[in-house]
């Protein structure tokens, strides 16, 4: 299994919509809403311009995406990490977090949020990626945990 990352371009918008919709469909069904699900082409094109996105390729097949934004010097936020369901549980997410840490060499702090109810995400970020929960937030009717990794 060969994993590669390619920076997304505007022409990747529809492909990314398909990846996001596949990856976030269960969240949409579970919570009734999900910011990553159901994006329009215009929304995804704007998102690609605003936040660098990297397409996760497994044996050259697009299977996920990771995106990050700079909050301040040496502080970043992972704004999206998604893998299509049939490729989840194969280590791609862990490798994507490592990719982000290597890409932003100056990082001292990386944050992200995920729904508290998604125990598998909480376990993934804390046990496999070295994050810890620092606070809770609410987005509509969804309680979110804010995670941080520091070095």
For each of these PLM feature ranges, what is it?
Residues 17, 21-44:
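Conserved GNAT-fold acetyl-CoA-binding loop/helix
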Residues 43-55, 77:
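A short helix-loop-beta-strand connector motif used in the catalytic cores of GNAT acetyltransferases and
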Residues 55, 61-70, 77-82:
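Conserved beta-strand in the GNAT
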Residues 81-88, 114-116:
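A short, internal acetyl-CoA/4′-phosphopantetheine-binding micro-motif in the GNAT/acyltransferase core
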Residues 83, 89-102, 127:
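Conserved acetyl-CoA-binding loop-helix of GNAT-fold acetyltransferases
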Residues 97, 104-116:
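Conserved GNAT acetyl-CoA-binding A-motif
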Residues 111-122, 138-142:
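Conserved beta-strand-loop-alpha-helix junction that forms the acyl-donor binding cleft
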